[in-house]
UniProtKB/Swiss-Prot annotation:
One of its GO terms (cellular component) is cytosol. This is Pyrimidine-nucleoside phosphorylase. Substrate binds at R168, K187. The gene is pdp. Belongs to the thymidine/pyrimidine-nucleoside phosphorylase family. Phosphate binds at K81, H82, S83, T92, K108, M109, S110, T120.
Length: 433
């Protein structure tokens, strides 16, 4: 087989076979196929697309390019959730303990975040003492015992995806649905998931800004999962404004604690219940989505979700008393209110710009080397559709520097107020299974 023939085949709009896809991925991972040929193929895929079978074969070739995590010693169906990312997306912190409290095993591998705030691990590390440095055996034992544990990403998972992703980034071939779908699904499958729930975001703060693109990506990922024997369901949710109120690490942990008590922001709590009920249903702990949701609402009400969170934190060295006393979380030196300059209704909160403002305070990383300030961030006091009076707080800024004019300016530019009432956006657009 010659790579040039395969590039030509895809350029002319033909489907590649399983053997051809394996040849490409193995050769590229080993370094036998140079970047310039892989770039040409990526661009051919960008314009010509791939059918469902090719996309599934590409996914599995990337899974087999490196190590895979074996979770077979964990009892039950392992369901993983993936969000395509957004601002203030704390769902993992709530969903883990919430579904674990009704018996769904949560074996979560998480990363540290690049971007507006930290990743799940950074957020959890704002709990004093909490750590993810546990061995694979400890990880599996903890999940069997408490139904939940979180470990840092390790091992050589999907090296083909890492290499191809870096190449796509610099060759203008990121926005190809088969390439995005196979990239996301290969990571989830390599990490040992039996079933997968996807939260595909759409709107200005999302990677897929257009609803039709978001639907196409969701359908592609659900199709891959079902073709390779991993039951997969997707939800398409709104990211035109940040989710919940908190943007920042310790601030999001506090919001997660409130939500586990059933006292969280309405939109955030609803999304957690919808995603969670899909996880419980796929784990075969409930016979319908309605029954699953009822179980989760009960776990919030009777305190078992919160207790599971405490047990989880303590098992990994964390001070679980932060759950009852959030003042033990890292605290910012300065608390500054951003006041509304006029009466009216909040008409727009540009999610990614608000995320950038939180990052300027130190809540996120610009590069892998940056340090992160776990205490700082923003808490929205109003969401789209809310009425506001002049002088009322729009956002509370938690900062470790006194002077925050740059952050205020950014927020004023990106939180718009209209004289006439505004409808709050739809939270969930579609469900795909």
């Amino acid at each position: 087989m010659r790579m040039v023939d395969l590039i030509e085949k895809k350029r002319d709009g033909h489907a590649l076979t399983k053997e051809e896809i394996q040849f490409i991925i193995e050769g590229y991972t080993k370094g036998d196929i140079p970047d310039y040929q892989m770039s040409a193929l990526a661009m051919a895929i960008f314009f010509r697309g791939m059918n469902e079978e090719e996309t599934a074969e590409l996914t599995m070739a990337m899974v087999h390019s490196g190590d895979t995590i074996d979770l077979s010693r964990i009892e039950g169906i392992k369901v993983d959730k993936h969000s395509t990312g957004g601002v203030g997306d704390t769902t993992t912190l709530v969903l883990g303990p919430l579904v674990a409290s009704v018996g769904v095993p949560v074996a979560k591998m998480s990363g540290r975040g690049l971007g507006h705030t930290g990743g799940t691990i950074d957020k959890l590390e704002s709990v004093p003492g909490f750590h993810v440095e546990i061995t694979n055996d400890e990880f599996i034992d903890l999940v069997n015992k408490n139904k939940i544990a979180v470990v840092g990403q390790s091992g050589n998972l999907t090296p083909a995806d890492k290499k191809l992703y870096a190449l796509r980034d610099v060759t203008a071939t990121v926005n190809s649905i088969p390439l995005i779908a196979s990239s996301i699904m290969s990571k989830k499958i390599a990490a040992g998931a039996d079933a997968i729930v996807l939260d595909v975001k759409t709107g200005v703060g999302a990677f897929m800004k257009d609803l039709n693109d978001a639907k196409a990506l969701a359908k592609a990922m659900v199709d891959i999962g079902n073709r390779v024997g991993r039951k997969t369901m997707a939800i398409i949710s709104d990211m035109s404004q940040p989710l919940g109120y908190a943007i920042g690490n310790a601030l999001e942990v506090k919001e997660a604690i409130d939500t586990l008590k059933g006292e969280g922001p309405e939109d955030f709590q609803e999304l957690c219940l919808v995603l969670g009920s899909h996880m419980v249903y796929l784990a075969e702990k409930a016979s319908s989505l309605e029954e699953a949701r009822h179980m989760l609402e009960k776990a919030m009400k009777d305190g078992s979700a919160l207790q599971t969170f405490k047990t989880f934190l303590a098992a990994q060295g964390g001070d679980a008393s932060v759950v009852d006393d959030p003042s033990k979380l890292p605290q910012a030196k300065y608390i500054i209110e951003l006041e509304a300059k006029e009466d009216g209704y909040v008409s727009e909160i540009v999610a990614d710009a608000v995320g950038t403002a939180a990052m300027w305070l130190g809540a996120g990383r610009a590069t892998k080397e940056s340090t992160i300030d776990l205490a700082v961030g923003l808490v929205l006091r109003k969401k789209v559709g809310d009425a506001v009076k002049k002088g009322e707080s729009l956002v509370t800024i938690y900062s470790n520097r006194e002077q925050v004019d740059d952050v205020k300016q950014k927020l004023y530019e990106n939180i718009r107020i209209s004289a006439t009432p505004v409808q709050a956006p739809t939270l969930i657009y579609d469900k795909i299974s």
